[in-house]
From Swiss-Prot:
Statement: the UniProt record of this protein carries the keyword Zinc: no
Alphabetical keyword list: ATP-binding, Cytoplasm, Disulfide bond, Nucleotide-binding, RNA-binding, Transferase, tRNA processing, tRNA-binding
Superkingdom to which the source organism belongs: Bacteria
Protein name, as recorded: tRNA-specific 2-thiouridylase MnmA
Organism of origin: Prochlorococcus marinus (strain NATL2A)
A GO cellular component annotation in the UniProt record: cytoplasm
Length: 388
């Protein structure tokens, strides 16, 4: 579909929302959130901008982002609000990430930040400013609201109306993987105007609107890595090095390391080991301060346990279901059977599950998200557990 038609379709959809048409846009200072605000203004919404100040210093979540976001609000003629969220970001993200690395997992700060910081802080602000009806961000994802009618014959149905999360149309930019943990209350309040657009169209439209951020380079890293220079620099600032062993699966010691926090499942580079075949990290044992390695052909797993599940587009299943599971951002979702594990304290509630993949998967990484899909629909998701 030509870009003009896609944008017109987006504008028409934005104009169909019922209510007062007041919205606050989460502005990072990047082109995506900038165009989001511009499109909502064009669609006739009463728009205000809000930026969360997460860290001191340079970067998209820091001072640079605040300046660019303020510039966009000035250009569009809308109010700009700044919320000091450094304390909650330290507690929910930085502390949690460091704890994860100490435990030998690879944390996923982006999805946690979306739920526990960005969207929760925006929702809190909206509740305190009752003249604002909706939240909008520049994420590439889509929402089907509980009062909308769509063909959902491929989804399990229990008759309960739910807000449903879908992949963005641009599969190269789809961010639904990082949004699986958003609760129904937030989904019902949120708009993703870029959900039907590609990144290319976003750039074109930003230029058409002469937005100051239209040519701003896209951030290529996690905000923590961007802020500290690299994830290793961030980790080294807070976690002490602790020498340990690198071993094969049979326990044979073949090398040493300076801290398990510098390793992740599947890693090959940076092991500092010369071996007859390339070796990959297959397990990180925090209790023994050990990194276990193996050849790639001996690194696959066919199943994993997923915990802390949030069910999005469906209610928690009561029996095994066939799904596609994505275990890394931008990786392909693979066919699998989801077997519910029930909480004895909550009758018939699936709080974690066993995932059985049709084919062995390389680098199933504890701490990362496993997100369950049915076509474009996000059924739910959770964190990959260290237990097997």
């Amino acid at each position: 579909m030509p870009s003009e038609e896609t944008v017109e379709k987006t504008l028409k959809r934005l104009q169909t929302f019922s209510g007062s048409h007041s919205v606050v846009v989460g502005l990072s200072g990047g082109v995506d959130s900038s165009l989001t605000a511009a499109l909502l203004c064009k669609a006739g919404w009463d728009v205000e901008g809000l930026t969360l100040w997460l860290m001191k210093g340079k970067g998209s979540c820091c001072s640079d982002g605040l300046v660019d976001a303020a510039g966009i609000c000035d250009q569009l003629g809308i109010k700009h609000h700044i919320v000091d969220s450094k304390e909650i970001f330290q507690k929910e993200i930085i502390n949690n990430v460091l704890k994860g690395y100490e435990e030998g997992i690879t944390p996923l700060p982006c999805s946690r930040c979306n739920k526990s910081v960005k969207f929760s802080e925006m929702l809190k602000w909206v509740k305190e400013n009752k003249n604002i009806e909706k939240i909008a961000t520049g994420h590439y994802a889509r929402i089907r609201y509980s009062n909308e009618s769509f063909n959902e014959n491929d989804l399990p149905s229990d008759g309960i109306k739910r807000h449903k999360l879908l992949r963005g149309k641009d599969l190269n930019k789809d961010q639904s993987y990082f949004l699986y943990d958003l609760p129904q209350e937030i989904l019902g309040k949120t708009i993703f105007p870029l959900g039907e657009l590609t990144k290319e169209i976003t750039r074109i439209e930003a230029l058409k609107h002469s937005l100051k951020t239209a040519k701003k380079p896209e951030s290529q890293d996690l905000c923590l890595a961007e802020h500290y220079g690299s994830m290793n620099a961030f980790i080294d600032k807070y976690l002490p090095q602790k020498k340990g062993e690198v071993v094969l699966k049979n326990g044979q010691i073949i090398g040493s390391h300076n801290g398990i926090q510098h390793f992740t499942i599947g890693q090959r580079k940076g092991l500092g080991i010369a071996w007859e075949v390339p070796l990959h990290v297959v397990e990180i044992d925090a209790s023994l301060n050990r990194v276990i390695v193996a050849p790639r052909e001996d690194s696959g797993k066919s199943e994993c346990i997923v915990k802390d599940i949030n069910w999005v587009s469906i209610e928690a299943p009561q029996e095994p279901i066939e799904v596609e599971v994505q275990i890394r951002y931008r990786s392909k979702a693979m066919k699998a059977k989801l077997i519910p594990i029930f909480d004895s304290n909550k009758e018939n509630y699936c709080y974690k599950c066993n995932i059985h993949f049709e084919k062995d998967q390389f680098s199933i990484t504890p701490g990362q998200a496993a997100v369950f899909y049915k076509g474009d629909y996000v059924l739910g998701g959770g964190l990959i557990s260290k237990e097997y």
